[in-house]
Amino acid sequence: IHGDINLIVEDFPYNQFDYCILTQTIQAVQKPDVLLNTLKKVSKNIIVGFNNSGRLSKSLQFLLSGSFDSLLKKSDSDQWYNTDYIHPCSIKDFKKLSTDLNFKIVSTFDVINMAQFTNGKMPSNLFCKEVLFHLKNER
């Protein structure tokens, strides 16, 4: 399926898919909260993957450089104004958004270390670079 993710999702009927998967997408869409709410009607299960902007190494980069470029860029040619990251967020930020939108967080997974984690068992917000969330629509 190909199209503008900000628009195309609205055209699908209720419960069209078993799973919807967003990888490296949620931070680049115009309105992540609206997209997630729209996906609720399309699927009861949503997998969301993103880079954790709240990890310790990113915080230290910003502290030492004083520049958002160090937080947002993927390569040396990227600057804060031309990166595809519109909404950098941390694991903690995404957990709050998920709760605010009435999603149940079924599981979270540290992609780099290939480890599942739960609240309090791993300092995920500080050390996890890439994360996957399995969300379930509670409605």
State where each predicted segment sits.
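A short SAM/SAH-binding and catalytic strip from SAM-dependent methyltransferases
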Residues: D18-K31
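S-adenosyl-L-methionine-dependent methyltransferase catalytic module, highlighting the catalytic core
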Residues: Q30-K41, N45-E138
